Amino acid sequence: VRLSEQLKPYKLKWIEDALISESIDQYEILRKRIPEQTLATGEQWYGVHPFFHAASRGIVDILQPDITWVGGLSAIIKIAHIAESAGIDVILHGGGGSVYGQHASYGLTGISMIECSGPVITPIGVPLEEKDRFPGTPIPKDGTIIPSDAPGFGLEIKKEWFPDFFS
């Protein structure tokens, strides 16, 4: 709360993950203490229920599910519908780093931005186009990313990667 007050002159767009993920009920207290500050969280929540809980109680402004941790594309669709019905925005945690997150962000209403980062093992300063990524995964250019329209979400999976499966 004190940090939020000290940062007011900088007009932060939002404060992200202000509390540990297990503290969902504490967000209700935080919301009452700093009602004017946009709050975002959810990247370490699992399944749909925490998002429903947060949206139905109006304790955050931006839900940030991680597509790999909440249960995949089906869960993201449910969360997007929950958020839309509550008037809450969704920004997928690391959504720009996977083709599934890219397609969900591009195709679902209520998702206004995409968070994009490269693999954590890639050295700082390496251009995005040179970072390790799954073949067929689009990369951002000039602040924009367009998901592939190729079959299979655009992933380029080669049979030689799975010799036992295709033998």
Model regions and ranges:
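Shared catalytic-loop signature of beta/alpha-barrel
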Residues: 5, 11, 19-144, 148
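Extended hydrophobic packing segments that form well-structured cores
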Residues: 151-167
